[in-house]
Amino acid sequence: MAVRFLALGLLIFVTSCSGRRVCESQQSCDDEQCDETLNIAIVGAGPSGAYSAYKMRHSGKDVGLFEYCNRVGGRLYTYQLPNTPDVNLELGGMRYITGAHNILQEVTKELGLKSVLFTEGFGRPGRTRYFLRGQSLTHEEVQSGDVPYNLTTIEKLNQGRIYEYYLKELTGFDIGNGSISREQLLKLRVSDGRLLYQLTFDEALDLVASPEGKEFARDVHVFHTEVTSDANAVSVFDDHLGEDGAGDAILTVEEGMQKVPKELIKEFKKTSASNQVQLNKYLQAIRSKSDHSFVLYFRPTSTVDGKTTILDYRPLQRVCARQVILALPVFALRRLDWPPLHEGRAETAYAAVRNMAASKVFMTFDQAWWLDRNFTDNTAFVTKGDTPFSQMYDWKKSNVSGDYILIASYADGNNTLYQKVLRDQGESINGSEPGANRVSEPLKNNILDHLSEAYGVDRSTIPEPKTAVSQFWTDYPFGCGWITWRAGYHFDDVMSTMRRPSLKDEVYVVGADYSWGLMSSWTEGALETADAVLKDYFKGECAKPPSVDHLDSHMA
């Protein structure tokens, strides 16, 4: 009997704690009492949210930044393994392009962060190999040598510039030695009159490529994002030929890419006592009041070993705000309980993009076997292939332990989803990081099996990794490493809706998932969308006080 009374008491306690509900009628929303009142609420502490907060640091208004987990940075995630503590591993974004990523370049300078050369770039000639259809090929062989594809004579002549050739055949546009702009790409038509963006990769290349030529173009692209399913054909040409990728040096931040949002938030917090940051807050719902303010309903979360859990038994926190910036991935945004997001106008706009899973697996070894000419004839700092590991990058040597680090797999799409299944099977390997970042025996074996094929060595000769860590960009709130634009959608037709889904509400959306083409997979895309929204709707809040402008003029 005592046990039954205890259980009843616990039920009453939990019910009373979680008894706050999201208001449903206009009257109940107007009557809602707030636990906290702000001028501006920013939800999401990734690059776009951190940048938005930073730009408003001098606003003099009550600005709150809320983050789902216990970590700021979003898809910028710098990590250190215990045996290589002096080397930053980038589990998310790892580089940027000077001359193309101008906002990020300026922000790093403004924050006093040091940028250094990203050694391998995108795979440098002489240091990069491809493993295609079971054959190991040098970069030069892929460009102009024998490849295991039955290309036509004209495709063979254009092997090293296959995308330039196909674009000209499709649309008549000759790129020459230059690049192509977004505006130009979106106006291009194929021979039957259709706009190029209305076609998928397969539909477009079927018009001009041989079956083998199409597969060659697909495989040398490596990433699945732009060349599978309903991906917009413009995306792959933008990736190879667009002006957004045409820059100078490829750099990274010496202190780690995550240092950028960390420093942005640090500056935001220290500038004013009215600027605040709250971690481990899950935004469950938004409701409007008659006075055009908003009630944001947050549920506390808990993060352990990289996995964040929503604490459903904890009461909702009600935060009221006059304006809201949702710096959320589209995966999380579409799951938010806010009625305007689920109306036709917004639903149509967000349907323009598709989530693309992405992943990285780092391993450390006591020898750099992939660079040892006594071990393999196929030595390479970077290997790209049509196998589940997709891409492998040499990642330096630790001066602390002398151990060597490898991105053993950098994958997207179905390769990532397959590897995630393997990650969730079996025991963790010795030296694996815990929780969401673990590397299992099946995952390790699959990656090393395929790497042994690419390097032409017996699997048994590859040493066991000393430590390992994985990151799968598949779960809430991210749902993906980046997005791809679906065929049939014109960016300019949906961009304004994506960034302001309801014209009568001051709720705005920022982040890389709402940026154009190639930029959607870069930090620059997150900063671009934030910059655009801030310039359109928050000019006053982003203005520097006169004293700051005066100081800057003497420091330039």
From Swiss-Prot:
The keyword Zinc-finger does not apply. One of its GO terms (molecular function) is L-amino-acid oxidase activity. Albumen gland. Disulfide bonds: none annotated. Keywords: Antibiotic, Antimicrobial, Glycoprotein, Signal. InterPro entries: Amino_oxidase, FAD/NAD-bd_sf, Flavin_monoamine_oxidase. Glycans are attached at N150, N177, N374, N399, N414, N430. GO terms for biological process: amino acid catabolic process; defense response to bacterium. Residues 1-19 form the signal peptide. Coiled coil: none annotated. Homotetramer. To A.fulica achacin protein. Has antibacterial activity against Gram-negative and Gram-positive bacteria. This is Aplysianin-A. It comes from Aplysia kurodai (Kuroda's sea hare).
